[in-house]
Amino acid sequence: MGKRYVVALKDAVTGVLYGGGGTFRILIDEESSGAKHLSCLVNTMNRGTRGSEHKHDVEHLWYILSGKGTMYIGGKAYAVGPEMAVFAPAGVLHRIDVGSDEDLTYVVVYAPPGPEQQLKQFGARAFDQR
């Protein structure tokens, strides 16, 4: 299959987040589109899910599509919901806790790419802090 510049959500590479607490969908990465400087995903975390604290060696951006939760970035808590953008610098610990009312769906951008490949290979275990 050739590189795709337009990818429908239904055609994304999909896997399980957080030990069954949600789903990742990789829309844009080097494998699918040839993107060398960023990747783009759409993730859904199930309501009531508590994410595991982790960090990446790359910058990380979220854009919340639906649902509400709390983002912890560098030890500080932020209430987040639809139409909000969130940024975590490279190397900074972060996690997401989802509220109990509804699932949390958000766009993720990694720049440069990399963490999405760990998700493909290891799923939720990719970012365990041990």
Functional labels for PLM-detected ranges:
Residues 40-42, 87, 102-118:
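A short hydrophobic beta-strand segment most commonly corresponding to one strand
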Residues 26-28, 41-56:
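Conserved short histidine dyad/triad with adjacent acidic residue
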Residues 75-90:
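Short acidic-glycine-tyrosine-enriched beta hairpin
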Residues 1-38, 121-130:
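A short, N-terminal "cap"/entry segment at the start of jelly-roll beta-barrel domains
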Residues 98-99:
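Asparagine-centered strand-capping/turn motif at beta-strand->loop junctions
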Residues 59-69, 74:
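Glycine- and acidic-residue-biased ligand/ion/polar-headgroup-sensing regions
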Residues 43, 68, 76-78:
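Well-ordered beta-strand scaffold positions
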